[in-house]
Amino acid sequence: MTTETLACTYAALMLSDAGLPTSAENIAAAVKAAGVSVRPTMPIIFARFLEKKSVEALMAAAATQAPTATSAAAAPAAGEASGKAEEKKKEEPEEEGDDDMGFGLFD
């Protein structure tokens, strides 16, 4: 993501949070106040996109589609538990196999 895109995104989020309209003029003013220079078309593109969908609707959609931390953490934990059980099963036959090899280094 470019600096221009991030600046316009943060400006739109800030304007929405403040309850101000996300017009091209407001986005351009917020970006200019932040000291970031963007192409003149960037605020227009963002404003036209946000005419069709509000920032709140986009944030709500992102929140419902994002995986939760608990489900993401639970899946690897379950995989690790079964993986550890499999490792223990695999280790036991190897230990028995070492005794039967008959190397006898310390006998």
UniProtKB/Swiss-Prot annotation:
Subunit structure: P1 and P2 exist as dimers at the large ribosomal subunit.
Keywords assigned: Ribonucleoprotein, Ribosomal protein
Name this polypeptide is given: Large ribosomal subunit protein P1
UniProt xrefs under InterPro entries: P1/P2_N_sf, Ribosomal_P1/P2
Gene3D superfamilies in the cross-refs: 1.10.10.1410
Organism, scientific name: Leishmania peruviana
GO process terms (BP): cytoplasmic translation; translational elongation
One example GO MF annotation: protein kinase activator activity
Gene Ontology cellular-component terms listed: cytosolic large ribosomal subunit
Span list, region Disordered: 67-107
Compositional bias annotation for Low complexity: 67-82
Matches recorded under HAMAP family: Ribosomal_L12_arch (MF_01478)
Ribonucleoprotein listed as a keyword: yes
Job of this protein: Plays an important role in the elongation step of protein synthesis.
Family: Belongs to the eukaryotic ribosomal protein P1/P2 family.
Biased composition (Basic and acidic residues): 83-92
